[in-house]
């Protein structure tokens, strides 16, 4: 019998579970203050939903053996858009939903097998509004989310913002047969692949210029305007940065415009963004999101209000960045209730109830304790830091 978890899956210890719950609880309280209501889509969906109408590769979905094509969700947005377009179709727009739950991705391991990537996410979806103010609302909420999570201040946070239409504008000047290859190089910032790309040298230098363009929004927008002139995408980004950049700066978050910002999934059409944290090794993407109007259109039976934008936060990744000093439990005291005679068990249960009423964690010895060694061993095994004796 194999007693290990499936390849890529993992067990979380009590401390990790507690931190996940604490982070998710703080986020849910914030979402509700902003008027978002909880929705809980199923873990199992039909494959045509999970592939997000072609936005997600079929190979990345962990499939279930059944009479119809089913799988485990690799992300939650597609399921919520499906629900908004069916069960909540008659509801007035905009819809503000938040969710928290586990997603499952299927990756190919080095040996050709399958690795399961299980992750706990928390996020919001704003469906049914086209206004740029919706984008500003989502980014503002993401910025405020960082404040309630209380990430250790030693980690530097960067908010990267891009636009798929801006990326398409950049790619439009290249041969259509090479667009996919160039897009991958741009999105991956793959300088090595660029050196072997079969294009003219001036085109190679132009691609490199775009790859190096990420930085302060005002400077990047000026550079893009010098190349492409004024257009609606650049104008909207200017308007957005006017509000978002000062808000982020107040919270110590650097904002950068990245013309090459792409996503693994082809869900997004318009604004895209990623929140990246420095770490002891490599940068970590702890949140990502964007506009997915095209996805809403594909799922909707109506042509009206087919707009959507959202983000998801990786609670598992955030957990590793939260300062241990910021773990605010109701009470960090854990009491062992001990007794020397079995007849005192009833009194011990009454004492435990009183401690619980005060919000104090307490456990009862299952046997009478007669020696100091027994008592100390039980304190250690139950991870208690205080003892109360029942006479």
Swiss-Prot record:
Keywords: Amino-acid biosynthesis, Cytoplasm, Histidine biosynthesis. One of its GO terms (cellular component) is cytoplasm. The keyword Amino-acid biosynthesis applies. It is found in: Cytoplasm. One of its GO terms (molecular function) is histidine-tRNA ligase activity. InterPro entries: aa-tRNA-synth_II/BPL/LPL, HisRS-like_core, HisRS/HisZ, HisZ. Pathway: Amino-acid biosynthesis; L-histidine biosynthesis; L-histidine from 5-phospho-alpha-D-ribose 1-diphosphate: step 1/9. GO terms for biological process: histidyl-tRNA aminoacylation; L-histidine biosynthetic process. Pfam families: tRNA-synt_His. This function is generally fulfilled by the C-terminal part of HisG, which is missing in some bacteria such as this one. Belongs to the class-II aminoacyl-tRNA synthetase family. HisZ subfamily. PANTHER family: HISTIDINE--TRNA LIGASE, MITOCHONDRIAL-RELATED, HISTIDYL-TRNA SYNTHETASE. Heteromultimer composed of HisG and HisZ subunits. NCBIfam families: hisZ_biosyn_reg, PRK12292.2-1. Required for the first step of histidine biosynthesis. May allow the feedback regulation of ATP phosphoribosyltransferase activity by histidine. This is ATP phosphoribosyltransferase regulatory subunit. It comes from Prochlorococcus marinus (strain NATL1A). The lineage of its organism: Bacteria, Bacillati, Cyanobacteriota, Cyanophyceae, Synechococcales. The gene is hisZ.
């Amino acid at each position: 019998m194999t007693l290990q978890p499936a390849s890529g899956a993992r067990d979380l210890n009590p401390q990790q579970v507690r931190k996940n719950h604490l982070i998710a609880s703080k986020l849910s309280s914030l979402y509700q203050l902003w008027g978002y209501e909880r929705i809980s889509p199923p873990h199992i969906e039909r494959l045509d939903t999970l592939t997000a109408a072609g936005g997600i590769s079929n190979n990345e979905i962990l499939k279930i053996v059944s009479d119809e094509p089913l799988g485990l969700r690799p992300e939650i947005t597609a399921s919520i858009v499906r629900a908004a377009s069916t069960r909540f179709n008659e509801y007035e727009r905009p819809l503000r939903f938040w969710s928290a739950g586990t997603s499952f991705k299927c990756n190919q391991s080095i040996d050709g097998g399958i690795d399961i990537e299980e992750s706990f996410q928390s996020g919001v979806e704003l469906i049914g509004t086209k206004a740029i103010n919706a984008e500003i609302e989502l980014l503002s909420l993401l910025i405020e989310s960082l404040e309630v999570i209380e990430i250790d201040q030693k980690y530097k946070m960067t908010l990267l913002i891009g636009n798929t239409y801006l990326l398409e504008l950049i790619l439009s000047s290249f041969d259509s047969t090479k667009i996919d290859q160039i897009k991958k190089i741009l999105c991956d910032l793959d300088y090595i692949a660029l050196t072997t790309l079969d294009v003219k040298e001036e085109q190679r230098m132009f691609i490199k210029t775009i790859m190096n363009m990420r930085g302060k929004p005002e400077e990047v927008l000026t550079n893009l305007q010098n190349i492409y002139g004024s257009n609606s995408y650049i104008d909207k980004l200017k308007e957005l940065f006017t509000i978002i950049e000062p808000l982020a700066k107040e919270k110590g978050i650097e904002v950068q415009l990245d013309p090459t910002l792409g996503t693994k999934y082809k869900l997004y059409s318009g604004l895209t963004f990623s929140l990246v944290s420095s770490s002891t090794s490599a940068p970590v993407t702890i949140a990502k999101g964007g506009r997915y109007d095209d996805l809403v259109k594909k799922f909707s039976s109506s042509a009206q209000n087919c707009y959507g934008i959202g983000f998801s936060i990786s609670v598992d990744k955030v957990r590793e960045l939260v300062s241990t000093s910021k773990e605010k439990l109701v009470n960090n005291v854990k009491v062992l209730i001990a007794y020397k005679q079995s007849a005192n068990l009833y009194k011990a249960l009454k004492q435990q109830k009183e401690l619980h009423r005060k919000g104090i964690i307490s456990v009862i010895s299952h046997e009478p304790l007669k020696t100091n060694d027994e008592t100390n061993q039980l304190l250690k095994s139950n991870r208690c830091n205080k003892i109360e004796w029942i006479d």
